[in-house]
Regions:
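Short acidic-glycine-tyrosine-enriched beta hairpin
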Residues: 65-79
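Ligand-binding loop in jelly-roll beta-barrel domains
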Residues: 67, 81-105
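DNA-contacting interfaces and partner/effector-binding or oligomerization modules
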Residues: 71, 107-108
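Amphipathic, well-ordered alpha-helical segments in soluble domains
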Residues: 23, 50-53, 102-105, 129-133
Length: 143
């Protein structure tokens, strides 16, 4: 498994910060090759937002106790306090990029770009440009 992660102020704690319109608090990437499974289960969610981009392979998400297989070219958005349950499997060769963010204008920014409340999965296509944006965020937080 390949992993590259970065955290604002070197903390892995999720935070809620309303001091700016949008603050990236952590971001990273995972690429499973041989690890059989990488599960995440946050029954109470987090205090911040999370956006995940499936760059290759697929991921298994659970919304309202129903499994949804999300393939490459899709993004998944979790809002604060939403339960988060998902798994990546090595056999799927999943490559995922993720970012956690907070801020005082996040809801309006998401609405402006078409992210509607109650929907989690959005198609955006497979583009190297998206991966490069995530890599830039990771590098910035690692400085």
């Amino acid at each position: 498994m390949y992993t590259n992660n970065a955290y604002l102020n070197n903390t892995t704690m999720d935070i809620k910060d309303k001091s700016k319109p949008l603050i990236v608090t952590s971001c990273g990437t995972y690429h499973l090759f041989t690890r059989p499974k990488l599960p995440t289960w946050r029954p109470r969610g987090r205090r911040d937002f999370q956006l995940l981009y499936i760059a290759s392979g697929k991921a298994h998400f659970h919304f309202s106790q129903k499994e949804e297989i999300v393939t490459a070219g899709h993004i998944v958005l979790y809002r604060p306090k939403e339960p988060q349950k998902y798994e990546y499997y090595g056999e799927d060769q999943t490559e995922v990029y993720w970012v956690h963010f907070t801020g005082n204008d996040v809801t309006n920014i998401l609405r402006y770009y078409g992210f509607t409340k109650g929907k989690h999965v959005y198609y955006c296509g497979k583009r190297l440009e998206y991966q490069n944006h995530f890599k830039t965020m990771i590098q910035e937080l690692q400085m």
